[in-house]
Swiss-Prot record:
GO molecular function, one term: pantoate-beta-alanine ligase activity
SUPFAM superfamilies, per database record: Nucleotidylyl transferase (SSF52374)
The protein's name: Pantothenate synthetase
Pathway: Cofactor biosynthesis; (R)-pantothenate biosynthesis; (R)-pantothenate from (R)-pantoate and beta-alanine: step 1/1
Length: 299
């Protein structure tokens, strides 16, 4: 696995990967190879590795990135303590057969004097964007830069970050990026907790409390499966479960359109039940799709 720390190095690595011998092309020995891209902030777990495996299955070569992006953290958030386990992460990526990994420093991605931002208006202020002002502007900016630098054919993201996915899909469409955003299902621990790099912040008791998020979503999912289509009643079912853990502070509990993130009052098509809550000092998010999987979330 090739490790690149500069933009020039990763571009050279991708160029070599794209034009290397391609056994998938019948009757030819050389030709353009497809590139799958998995951008991460590191502290990798099985959720990230599921994205790598999906990319490996669909693309000729896979590139990953590890970059803790400062512009998507607020002033009182966990940028300083976000887990940084680069060597362990690289070992996992190499084991999974990743071809190259981009490991830039902040100065490489945001050189002195940089003043350009990318923001998806309206969407960037919904769900997580409402409680974390500037978060999705930071996400869209760094991902746009990574797409421009790597130039992948497909980029892989997890459904757990559904609001991020909605922002990035709109950005890709509006700015005419020539790539496909692929969304992979949430990977959960055996007890139902959605995998997250931030789970390592939780104490044993907080981890137990955090299970209320997935329980609330399952209650909403069960209500929908039983025929309930009133968004307010579905929310009430979820809120009732969340109340079982009074120490958990709910940021939001919503039923929304998965593409626009607008609240859905009457569920007549695909919808997303989504929750964010603070367990101790740790903010957790989770979601579940209601009804048929929308096109935006299909593999």
């Amino acid at each position: 696995m090739r490790r690149a720390e500069t933009i020039a190095e990763i571009r050279a690595a991708v160029r070599e990967l794209r034009y290397r011998e391609n056994p998938r092309l019948k009757g030819e020995t050389w030709g353009t190879r497809s590139i799958g891209f998995v951008p991460t902030m590191g502290a990798l777990h099985e959720g990230h590795l599921s994205l790598v495996r999906a990319a490996k299955a669909e693309c000729d070569a896979v590139v990953a990135s590890i970059f803790v992006n400062p512009t998507q953290f607020g002033p009182n958030e966990d940028f300083g303590k976000y887990p940084r386990t680069v060597e362990a992460d690289c070992a996992l990526l190499e084991r999974e057969g990743v071809d190259a990994v981009f490991l830039p420093q902040v100065e490489e991605m945001y050189p002195a004097g940089a003043t350009t931002w990318v923001e998806v208006e309206e969407l960037s202020g919904r769900l997580d964007g409402a409680s974390r002002p500037g978060h999705f502007r930071g996400v869209a900016t760094v991902v746009a830069k990574l797409f421009h630098i790597v130039g992948p054919d497909r980029a892989y993201f997890g459904q757990k970050d559904a609001a991020q996915v909605a922002n990035l899909r709109r950005m890709v469409r509006d700015l005419d990026f020539d790539l496909e955003v692929v969304v992979c299902p949430i990977v959960r621990e055996a007890d139902g907790l959605a995998m997250s790099s931030r789970n390592r912040y939780l104490s044993v008791e907080e981890r137990r409390q955090g299970l209320v998020l997935s329980r609330a979503l399952r209650a909403m999912e069960a209500g929908h499966a039983a025929g309930e289509r009133d968004g307010r009643r579905l929310l009430a079912a979820g809120a009732s479960v969340m109340a079982e853990e009074p120490a958990v502070r709910v940021d939001y509990l919503r039923v929304v359109d998965p593409e626009t993130l607008v609240d859905v009052e009457a569920v007549s098509g695909p919808a997303l039940a989504t929750v964010a809550a603070y367990v101790g000092a740790t903010r957790l998010i989770d979601n579940v799709l209601l009804g048929e999987t929308p096109a935006a979330f299909k593999l």
